Amino acid sequence: MKFDMHCHTKEGSLDGKVEIEEYIRILKEKGYQGMLVSDHNSYNGYRYWRDHIKGKKYTDFVVLKGIEYDTNNAGHFLVILPEGVKPRILEMRGMPVELLTRVVHAYGGILGPAHPFGEKYLSFGSSKKYQRNPKIMQEFDFLEAYNSCEVEERNQEAKKAARKYFLAEFGGSDSHKADCIGTAYTEFREPIHTESDLIEQVK
């Protein structure tokens, strides 16, 4: 199954320009079977899909609930929790990465750095946490090894780190506007219909 694993919606991200229904339409046209909604410190994009679209349209397309969390010491992280888990703390930005990791794993979820070697103040690879102890990468479950918004050199650096620390590799567009949607993907060998399915495959 082909998923875009980094998507920002108008309903959930202040800088998102595309409504989630339009997102789904574009991805379906491009041959995708699913997406991870990963708005900034918010589940509102996913909530809109759940409350207004789910079960009524696009029933052959999988929408997974995620979040791009802004830590106070290690950049941005993609987080996926099992369905039904609702920790409000993830919509309050600013936890240190150590606490975020403990919280996510305590709830049975997974996390990994978004654009890990990208823009300086948003990326784990630029943080003092990583520079002082690169092996901290082993505490995560995956790494965004390809991000459409980053230059090839940065993506290659991410792929190298993922393979060094034996982390699952995600590809995502990190799209905020229509022309970026579907410019990256992650291929899953087994069917994914829920967040728990995804977590099981990554672990």
Regions found by a protein language model. Give the residues of each.
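Caspase-like (clan CD) cysteine peptidase catalytic core
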Residues: 92-94
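Glycine-rich, histidine-containing beta strand-loop boundary motifs that form or position
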Residues: 39, 67, 115, 173
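Substrate-recognition element of Asp-dependent hydrolases with the DxDx(T/V) motif
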Residues: 37, 108-119
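Conserved beta-strand positions
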Residues: 37-40, 113, 145-148
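Charged catalytic cores and adjacent phosphate/nucleic-acid-binding surfaces used
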Residues: 1-26, 32, 44-53, 57-58, ...
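Two-metal-ion RNase H-like nuclease active-site motif
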Residues: 62-68
